[in-house]
Amino acid sequence: MNISQIISYWGYPDEEYDIVTEDGYILGLYRIPYWRTDNNKNLAQRVVVYLQHGLLTSASSWISNLPNNSLGFILADAGYDVWMGNSRGNTWSRKHLYLETSSKEFWAFSFDEMAKYDLPASIDFTVKQTRQEEIFYVGHSQGTTIGFITFSTISKIAERIKIFFALAPVFSTKYLKSPLIRMTYKWKSIVMAFSGNKDFLPKTSFKKFIGSKLCPLQIFDKICLNILFMMFGYDPKNLNMSRLDVYFSHNPAGTSVQNMLHWSQLLNSTHLKAYDWGSPDLNLVHYNQTTSPLYNMTNMNVATAIWNGKSDLLADPEDVNILHSEITNHIYYKTISYYNHIDSLFGLDVYDQVYHEIIDIIQDNL
């Protein structure tokens, strides 16, 4: 099922939009405007919550569990107007006004462009469509990264964000342990040769078959689980095994090779910086300086709440501590001892540990 079909399957209303970025990418934006049994369809006064997915995932990550354990549905049931964005290059954002997806030009992007073009276009559309002055923003993983960049560099977008909820935030990567990123760094030439400098781990029929047919089988389920834990961290007791086929049928949802290389460039760094084009001359063309510029977190004044886990291989607790020290307006910070990188999406106890707290903070700030 696609995202709209998942929303409809559980009895919720859904709206789907194609929005166009300043540089011509066409992104899928999804909306759950109200909850299943709500007959009051007056949306004028509804509080808007915008959700942005992480690396190699899509908006489906917010609705992959049962309604009582999926943030997209939980927020709709709580009376909020829910919007879910998609970053360029994933399953639901692989279109462009004039570039073909088979071209290298289409895939010449990283999270720099997601922060510069995708997120501003998505938030601007959401704000105009709902006629709301401010919205609440929830990001997971890379969804927090592009939030940090956008809100620290584009003030007109930052002014629209009431509170930034950062789940498993990634900014500093000095202590990052994820084998996926480290292998990309170590085997850069192999990755580029294998992927042709275009898309990285896109959703395909073969991978969908593996996720929906093979992973549920007892002989394969441990293999699939170990792949997840190798990438994100170990926490087998907090994962809903009955939904494993759903997770794998939608993920990985793809990104660009350049985006993965960008992440690999940041290994062992305590600061987030723009993509390094590989030579002083090319950097000079793109940035008017010979090195890729750093992003300055202290320029962001958006109220920020953070949830992270001690078993997270992508958002290591030490890195999150570095990030926390640079946030000028932090309002909440919680570390969960056993959480890995995807527990804040798929954890069995995620409502108790994270989601109800998000709703409480929203209600306290209306």
Curated annotation (Swiss-Prot):
The active site is at S141, D312, H341. It holds the Pfam family Abhydro_lipase. SUPFAM superfamilies: alpha/beta-Hydrolases. Its EC number is 3.1.1.-. One of its GO terms (cellular component) is intracellular membrane-bounded organelle. GO terms for biological process: lipid catabolic process. InterPro entries: AB_hydrolase_fold, AB_hydrolase_lipase, Lipase_euk. It is an enzyme of class 3 (hydrolase). GO terms for molecular function: hydrolase activity, acting on ester bonds. Keywords: Hydrolase, Lipid degradation, Lipid metabolism. PANTHER family: LYSOSOMAL ACID LIPASE-RELATED. Belongs to the AB hydrolase superfamily. Lipase family. This is Lipase member J. It comes from Homo sapiens (Human).
